UniProtKB/Swiss-Prot annotation:
RNA-dependent RNA polymerase which is responsible for replication and transcription of virus RNA segments. The transcription of viral mRNAs occurs by a unique mechanism called cap-snatching. 5' methylated caps of cellular mRNAs are cleaved after 10-13 nucleotides by PA. In turn, these short capped RNAs are used as primers by PB1 for transcription of viral mRNAs. During virus replication, PB1 initiates RNA synthesis and copy vRNA into complementary RNA (cRNA) which in turn serves as a template for the production of more vRNAs. Its EC number is 2.7.7.48. It comes from Quaranfil virus (isolate QrfV/Tick/Afghanistan/EG_T_377/1968). Disulfide bonds: none annotated. Coiled coil: none annotated. PROSITE patterns: RDRP_SSRNA_NEG_SEG. The gene is PB1. Residues 313-512 form the RdRp catalytic domain. Keywords: Nucleotide-binding, Nucleotidyltransferase, RNA-directed RNA polymerase, Transferase, Viral RNA replication. GO terms for molecular function: nucleotide binding; RNA binding; RNA-directed RNA polymerase activity. Belongs to the influenza viruses polymerase PB1 family. This is RNA-directed RNA polymerase catalytic subunit. RNA polymerase is composed of three subunits: PA, PB1 and PB2.
Amino acid sequence: MERLNSFLVSTLIRDGMSREEKEKLVGPYPVGIENTGLGAVSFLYKYVNVPPLAVGAPAPKTAESVLRSFEYNRLPDNGKGLRPRQYWMETDGPYPYDVTCANFHLSAAQEMHKSFLREHHAVIDKVTEAMYQRLKTTNADILTKGKQTWDPINKRSVPSAAAFKEITTVLRTYLKLVGFSVLDFVEAFHRMLMLPEMVYNRRVNAEKTVRKRKGGVITLEKKAVVVLETVHLTRNEDVRETVMGWATAFCSYLKSKERGKLKRRAIASANPILRMFLWIVEELHLELGKQEEMVSSTISIGGEEKRAKIIATPDGLSLNEFNIQATEDATKWNECLAPENFCLMHEIWWSHSIREEMGLPKPPESAEIMRQIFQQAFYLLSHKRIYLGKGHLIHNQTRAALLQWKEDHEKYMNEKTLEWFRKIKEHLDSEGYVKAPFGMLMGMLNAGSTTLALPATKWRLQPGMDCKTVRSSDDSMTVFSGKTRQLLMENINRFYDNLKLLGINISQKKTRFFQLKFGEYTSAYQDGDFTAQYGVGTAALRPEGSNPPDDFHSVASQTATSLRSGTVNFVGAQFRLGIGVDNVRRLYKIDRTPGKRQGVPDSALVLSDGGPSPWNFSNCHLPELALKWITHEQNPQATRYLERVMNPNNPFTADAAEITSFSRELNTLVETSLELPRNLFHTLKRFNATQKSLLRKGDNDFMKSCNLAMQLFEEVIPASLLQVPSGPQPMSQVMADVLRAQASALRSVGVHFTEEEMEEIRGALNTLEHDSNIDFE
């Protein structure tokens, strides 16, 4: 008999069995294996830095993902046609259960969504109404948060704020709007579609001939420059086509910070219009996941709360004679999700006729508006187009150029590139976008897809079986029970068939079954009542990236907090301090150099200067410089060194600053000083000020003006730090009204202004009301 894997053996052995019974089940095994738990593997994990940044053209990986979404559509001609579809009907024949499939069964999905609605209609209605009220009061500038966003007007990937500015400039020009709430922004998009004509500016690449002197010889050379081009659309059909083109455009990147994978994956970034729709969808589902009734969703929570839910949800299982726990892996998650299925789910939730048919109370009035917004979101998603981006670098002996994704350039492509390009070119349009009606792209609708999968848990449950699951997007863990072995098998097959009918494919190779209370979910490993987070993704030891002294201090203060909360013991604290300090040194390339400063004891050198760490588990709540000063206050050379480091007049030291924040204890705004006094090693970030073109200079000038305007606005109206205003009034007018009211209030309590002061106030009001062009929200 072959020996079984020891890890498998430890999962098969039950408590309460004799040694002989266990050996009959699994064969001979080492004595100690009975008590082996997850703690035995924790030391195998190494805390390392993330892999390097992804470089190269994203087009091959983007094409791979899009082609897979077509390939897994098992309808005739892969569901392509005038109206591409992913839903499977009875007339299409037997549903393909046995292969990876991107189709969802229409009638089965309807029944599952109805059963989910019957159980959760009250919480769905509560969250719908709360979300609608939030849309009316939330400022649309939430879209400025984020590193990269696709700017579809200029076909470039830029910081989110820059892409938002381009879209809002067009909206303001034609709709004369000043400020936007989220709801205003969505309405403005629809009003743009109705315009009879439109003129807008876009940036295009052009060639400019320049004179260049080299070695006394003047030559004419062509140089690539970016220039503004004015586009004039004179018909509503052209306006609609252009605006819809903007709203469906994506770009793709190669995913950096990837876990232990050899091959890179493509991720996508939407345009600001579609990002707004996706934000609304995600926020609703994140809020839904926070509700107590949604016991299976953990997408909205983290930390101790999430850990408790991972343990508590399986505990709600009705135990039977036969019980089992599955650690699941969904294969081809993004490629197989269908925008139509998302739309169907929300349509059923908010449909008056379906509610009436099921005998449920009517949805709130706001549900009709939410229903229309969600219909539009998934319509745009089903018409998405992904920009392939720059091509590979090609060169000969003297020149280099970038490949273009055109049929004419096939002669320059190697076999591997040619293979995928010939498959994708039928979906490629003249602007360089690939049409991708099926599936999702990585990073989209994580919370929405979590909710989409939940109806499968209870549908078609029979007496004598039970099922509980915890899910966060494509990661899930499920417990099953059955009164008989046959019922347990039927329960497992029922659940995975239900998921299959929703277009979710559970991998047979990667899904593992264990005894109850043993499994892995979102890198949290469960072993009985103990759940712990292991893995290279554990972020507690990663430097913050502010500057060396603050990052070192952060390592120590986080360790002190962990000790106080009981998260780590003193041994764990020592490890955490050592690894954390070492990681910060590595990030800033700080070498540990004993005897670096002549005459200064090595132990007095600060960490940022290559000195040793002063911390251990008993003193990590104290700042580094205070510890080193107390230790060396009798040594004049050490104290002189520390005084130089701490000298506030040092030209390289950032000025001390105060931060205005809201105190929950005092229920008011408070001024708080920075936790650590600034010193010589508090480096300042120097931003790249290179002006490559006049357009870049204009962008930078606009950014400086915005920062100055916001600084003035926050000084005049400190409450704006607490709540971002979302009204349609110009900032300048609001500031003028507040200044006038403040001056009037002060005079009413006996404060007298001199003539010079009154002149200054009148000048400020005149500037704000007449000379100001601060008209953004």
